[in-house]
């Protein structure tokens, strides 16, 4: 494949490596928390939720700052610093003598941010507008591919102990930084840089465009509730299968890889044809209906094959987010699309704070009472509420106005 600028394949490779590094550590996180905290899996679940929340909180406040710094000092420098900080984070977790070190590492990672924002900026800097969609698609595919490979590799490395995948993730992060240092040129030319402005770096200000989306309150409420429900996967999966099915790190890794593959296939092959046939409104309702059913069935699954069947069926839930975003994008003009997407990213950050706390508490509460599926029941309930909000506040309201 031909690229218009040498920085583009480097940015895509960086996204792939970074995503692999993130996925590697997931299968062994429960075992490491149990080891350091000397707690059972139910309490480890709660601690895992706190770790995810501290990352989300620091990332929420630091994300706009990192973006503004990349506009001031360039993409390459910010990418290098971010990746080095991620390497330090994983090293903290690999050699942590206590839980406090894990929390310090997660805070560092949240402040540093991830590579996705700067990598997107690299593509926007050097790619013609008519080709950006394809390049952004490749970037998303690299992220999805890394999330398939990472957990599988992490599950295999878990046989060496719960710290081995963190060592591998740290090595990948530093190798990623070395790759950028060696071969990636700066893409933001000096004349396009702007002074750092704290007003632009205000995370609360990112929500302002959401209040100018033409009567989209029900859509925004639905988007937030859906994102909180969907956080049941990253925040509880590894703990849930450890408690409910007593899976080891290898089995956890393969299941996460299967989940990533299922979602990626849905993004590539399912969303476009479904929206074309049914329209955005009905596509959202189809995805939410699948969420209500699949999440509820997860709560009562007792065999591994049942979980894999639900992973395949759960790909339909991937219809919800893109369809809601497509509807929202029609509520603002072209000049405000970027601001809208920034506001939606901030909404996702709120879900990333609230979701893990709610889901891990629900799982732990149920596990202590003999039923580990509490988090999935909560997710199913949230999907049902989102369905009602969307049906009454969007679909029927549009029919009345028509």
What is each of the regions a protein language model found here?
Residues 42, 158-171, 361-383:
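A membrane-interface helix-boundary motif in multi-pass transporters
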Residues 105-144:
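Cytoplasmic helix-loop-helix junction between adjacent transmembrane helices
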Residues 177-183, 377-402:
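Multi-pass alpha-helical transporter architecture, strongest
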Residues 281-324:
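C-terminal transmembrane helical hairpin of 12-TM major facilitator-type secondary transporters
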């Amino acid at each position: 494949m031909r690229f218009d600028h040498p920085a583009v394949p480097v940015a895509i490779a960086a996204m792939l490596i970074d995503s692999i590094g993130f996925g590697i550590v997931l299968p062994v996180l429960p075992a490491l928390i149990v080891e350091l905290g000397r707690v059972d899996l139910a309490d480890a679940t709660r601690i895992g939720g706190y770790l995810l929340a501290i990352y989300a909180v620091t990332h929420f406040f630091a994300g706009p700052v990192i973006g503004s710094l990349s506009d001031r000092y360039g993409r390459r420098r910010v990418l290098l610093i971010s990746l080095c900080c991620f390497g330090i984070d994983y090293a903290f977790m690999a050699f942590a003598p206590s839980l406090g070190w894990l929390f310090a590492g997660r805070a560092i990672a949240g402040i540093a941010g991830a590579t996705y924002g700067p990598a997107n900026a690299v593509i926007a800097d050097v790619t013609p507008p008519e080709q950006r969609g394809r390049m952004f698609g490749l970037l998303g595919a690299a992220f999805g591919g890394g999330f398939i490979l990472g957990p599988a590799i992490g599950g295999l490395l878990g046989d060496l102990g719960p710290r081995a995948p963190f060592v591998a993730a740290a090595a990948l992060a530093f190798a990623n930084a070395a790759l950028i240092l060696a071969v990636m040129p700066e893409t933001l030319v000096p004349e396009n840089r702007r002074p750092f402005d704290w007003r632009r770096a205000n995370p609360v200000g990112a929500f302002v465009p959401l209040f100018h989306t033409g009567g989209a309150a029900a859509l925004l409420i639905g988007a937030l509730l859906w994102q909180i429900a969907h956080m049941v996967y990253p925040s509880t999966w590894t703990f849930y299968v450890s408690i409910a099915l007593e899976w080891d790190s290898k089995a956890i890794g393969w299941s996460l890889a299967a989940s990533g593959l299922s979602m990626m296939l849905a993004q590539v092959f399912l969303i476009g044809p479904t929206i074309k046939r049914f329209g955005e409104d009905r596509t959202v309702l189809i995805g939410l209906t699948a969420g209500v059913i699949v999440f509820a069935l997860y709560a009562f699954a007792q065999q591994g094959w049942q979980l894999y069947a639900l992973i395949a069926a759960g790909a339909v839930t991937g219809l919800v987010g893109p369809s809601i975003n497509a509807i929202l994008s029609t509520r603002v003009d072209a000049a405000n699309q970027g601001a809208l997407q920034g506001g939606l990213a901030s909404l996702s950050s709120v879900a990333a704070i609230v979701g893990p706390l709610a889901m891990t508490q629900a799982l732990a509460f149920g596990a202590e009472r003999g039923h580990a599926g509490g988090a999935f029941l909560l997710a199913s309930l949230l999907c049902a509420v989102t369905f009602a909000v969307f049906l009454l506040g969007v679909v029927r309201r549009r029919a009345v106005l028509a």
